[in-house]
């Protein structure tokens, strides 16, 4: 077969660019797993391994991409359709997308291992910056007795007051999950949380035929078992998916400006307009509206300290 002429190559390139610019996603494939060195894409129900043009930069799970097939079961990603609502992580000193085109973030934790509200706050800031809806899921609620449940409710009271949803349930006992499942329906949801809180068990609960999916991914890879160390998308139905991000305990926030971090704490941010200085750090400046609110007890000291810790990290 003869090689394409420069004119033919340019015509093909321009056609692809026009499709991407127009947002014509009818032919788009979906990135369902990123294995670091290789992508797995869903091309209208067919699972394929894929490489990508390095000039495209980093690719995220749930990206809509334009592909060409260089082999019957292998593709090349030629372009990325415009992204909506993207979460990022820091990797090797660079900011890279974790997942794109997402609707909401499910922050998962459990009484064992115990959680830290500071970690929950980091996830909330990431959700705020991505303009996605966050909610909390406290798994292993069967481990609570009346006293420890009351203590947990007290620790989470600030989030209730701020209007965030908090779901309680037990994957092990399959109780308290109906409302949460309804919240997930029809949405693209990233699930996050520290190891041992039951994320994998929850995904297995939501997707009973998960083994079929992982076998399809393994077949596309051509060898071995599907990795659990990289982000991947689990389709629950045609309109619903869970995106797991193993190893990401806290999305990177170091790229955010000080004001962007503060805006992720809305109950604190509302007092910044009372500060004398526009660039107030809310620590030692005179006439600081945030400090006055803190002294009055109008904002949580724990939340304030959490915010200042995130701000300090970005200055290192």
UniProtKB/Swiss-Prot annotation:
Predominant subcellular localization, coarse grouping: cytoplasm
Chain positions recorded as Zn(2+) binding sites: 275, 280, 282, 288
Transmembrane region(s): none
High-level lineage: Bacteria, Pseudomonadati, Pseudomonadota, Gammaproteobacteria, Cardiobacteriales
Species for this entry: Dichelobacter nodosus (strain VCS1703A)
Nucleotide-binding found in the keyword field: yes
Keyword terms: Cytoplasm, GTP-binding, Hydrolase, Metal-binding, Nucleotide-binding, Ribosome biogenesis, RNA-binding, rRNA-binding, Zinc
Co-factor note (free text): Binds 1 zinc ion per subunit.
GO MF annotations in UniProt: GTP binding; GTPase activity; metal ion binding; rRNA binding
Name of the protein in its database record: Small ribosomal subunit biogenesis GTPase RsgA
InterPro entries, per the entry: G_CP_dom, P-loop_NTPase, Ribosome_biogen_GTPase_RsgA, RsgA_GTPase_dom
CDD domains linked to this entry: YjeQ_EngC
Assembly and oligomerization: Monomer. Associates with 30S ribosomal subunit, binds 16S rRNA.
EC numbers: 3.6.1.-
GO cellular component: cytoplasm
Family: Belongs to the TRAFAC class YlqF/YawG GTPase family. RsgA subfamily.
Cofactor annotation: Zn(2+)
Pfam families: RsgA_GTPase
Start and end residues of each CP-type G domain: 92-251
Residue ranges that the Swiss-Prot or TrEMBL entry lists as coiled coil: none
Biological processes, Gene Ontology terms: ribosomal small subunit biogenesis
Residues annotated as binding GTP: 139-142, 193-201
Biased composition (Basic residues): 8-18
């Amino acid at each position: 077969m003869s090689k394409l002429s420069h004119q033919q190559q340019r015509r093909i390139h321009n056609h692809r660019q026009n499709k991407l610019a127009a947002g014509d996603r009818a032919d788009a494939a979906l990135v369902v797993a990123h294995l670091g060195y290789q992508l797995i894409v869903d091309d209208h129900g067919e699972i394929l391994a894929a490489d990508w043009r390095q000039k495209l930069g980093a690719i995220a799970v749930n990206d809509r991409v334009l592909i060409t097939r260089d082999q019957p079961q292998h593709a090349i990603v030629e372009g990325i359709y415009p992204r909506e609502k993207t979460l990022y992580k820091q990797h090797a000193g660079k900011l890279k997308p974790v997942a794109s085109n997402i609707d909401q973030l499910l922050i998962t934790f459990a009484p064992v291992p115990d959680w830290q509200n500071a970690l929950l706050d980091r996830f909330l800031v990431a959700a705020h910056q991505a303009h996605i809806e966050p909610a909390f899921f406290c798994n292993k609620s069967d481990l609570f007795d009346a006293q420890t449940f009351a203590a947990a409710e007290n620790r989470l009271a600030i989030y209730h007051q701020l209007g965030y949803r908090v779901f309680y349930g037990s994957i092990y006992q399959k109780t308290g999950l109906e409302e949460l499942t309804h919240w997930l329906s029809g949405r693209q949801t990233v699930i996050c949380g520290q190891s041992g809180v039951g994320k994998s068990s929850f995904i297995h609960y939501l997707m009973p035929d998960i083994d079929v999916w992982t076998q399809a991914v393994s077949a596309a890879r051509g060898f071995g078992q599907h990795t659990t160390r990289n982000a991947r998308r689990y389709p629950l139905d045609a309109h619903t998916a869970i995106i797991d991000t193993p190893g990401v305990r806290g999305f990177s926030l170091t790229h955010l400006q000080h004001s962007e971090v503060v805006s992720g704490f809305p109950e604190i941010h509302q007092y910044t307009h009372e500060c004398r200085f526009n660039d107030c750090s809310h620590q030692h400046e005179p006439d600081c509206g945030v400090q006055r609110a803190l002294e009055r007890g109008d904002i949580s000291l724990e939340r304030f300290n959490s915010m200042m810790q995130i701000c300090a990290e970005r200055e290192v």
